[in-house]
Amino acid sequence: MSHSVRVYDTCIGCTQCVRACPCDVLEMVPWDGCKAGQIASAPRAEDCIGCKRCETACPTDFLSVRVYLGSETTRSLGLTY
């Protein structure tokens, strides 16, 4: 079952999620929208195993990285992005 990985613009560019991922799903890409000048990206979301370690590692109040397991979607959870 595939999982969906979403990175929101609340990302502060700290790299915690990238370092926490055991499957190398996330990477940092250049972005001018935060002080760090980079944002997490999920180019290999198909490799996500759904462990949610990236969510646990995220230091922002609203998790900048979210993993939606299988049939979960932002709509079914009442979230927007």
UniProtKB/Swiss-Prot annotation:
It is found in: Plastid, Chloroplast thylakoid membrane. InterPro entries: 4Fe4S_Fe-S-bd, 4Fe4S_Fe_S_CS, PSI_iron-sulfur_center, PSI_PsaC. Residues 2-31, 39-68 form the 4Fe-4S ferredoxin-type domain. It catalyses: reduced [plastocyanin] + hnu + oxidized [2Fe-2S]-[ferredoxin] = oxidized [plastocyanin] + reduced [2Fe-2S]-[ferredoxin]. It comes from the Eukaryota. [4Fe-4S] cluster 1 binds at residues 11, 14, 17, 58. Keywords: 4Fe-4S, Chloroplast, Electron transport, Iron, Iron-sulfur, Membrane, Metal-binding, Oxidoreductase, Photosynthesis, Photosystem I, Plastid, Repeat, Thylakoid, Transport. Its cofactor is [4Fe-4S] cluster. Its EC number is 1.97.1.12. GO terms for cellular component: chloroplast thylakoid membrane; photosystem I. GO terms for biological process: photosynthetic electron transport in photosystem I. The eukaryotic PSI reaction center is composed of at least 11 subunits. Apoprotein for the two 4Fe-4S centers FA and FB of photosystem I (PSI); essential for photochemical activity. FB is the terminal electron acceptor of PSI, donating electrons to ferredoxin. The C-terminus interacts with PsaA/B/D and helps assemble the protein into the PSI complex. Required for binding of PsaD and PsaE to PSI. PSI is a plastocyanin/cytochrome c6-ferredoxin oxidoreductase, converting photonic excitation into a charge separation, which transfers an electron from the donor P700 chlorophyll pair to the spectroscopically characterized acceptors A0, A1, FX, FA and FB in turn. This is Photosystem I iron-sulfur center.
